[in-house]
From Swiss-Prot:
Keywords: Gas vesicle. This strain probably produces some gas vesicles from the probable gvpO-gvpA-gvpF-gvpG-gvpJ-gvpL-gvpS-gvpK operon; it can be induced to produce more under certain growth conditions. It is found in: Gas vesicle. Might be a minor component of the gas vesicle involved in nucleating their formation. Gas vesicles are hollow, gas filled proteinaceous nanostructures found in some microorganisms. It is not clear what function gas vesicles perform in soil bacteria. It comes from Streptomyces sp. (strain CB03234). This is Gas vesicle protein G.
Length: 78
């Protein structure tokens, strides 16, 4: 790109930096959201709620399906 190109793009550096940070935050959030260990913990907690009578079978099934979908889909590949 050369020196002239770098100088012309210099005013956009904060915007490019912000975009990079946002991409990193989204990537980490997705990594945590789709982490199999985290999903397993949530499934265990969901089972505890069902056994304690805090949620009914219908709610359990709905939330369990959502968690299993997360395990199946995994993070987006960019």
């Amino acid at each position: 790109m050369g020196l002239l190109g770098e100088l012309l793009l210099l005013p956009a550096a904060p915007l490019r930096g912000t975009a990079w940070v946002l991409r990193q935050v989204v990537a980490e959030a997705e990594r945590q959201y789709y982490d199999p260990a985290a999903v397993q913990r949530e499934l265990a907690r969901l089972n505890e709620l069902l056994e304690a009578g805090e949620i009914d079978e219908e709610e359990f099934d709905r939330r369990e399906d959502e968690l299993l979908d997360r395990l199946e889909k995994g993070p987006r590949q960019s």
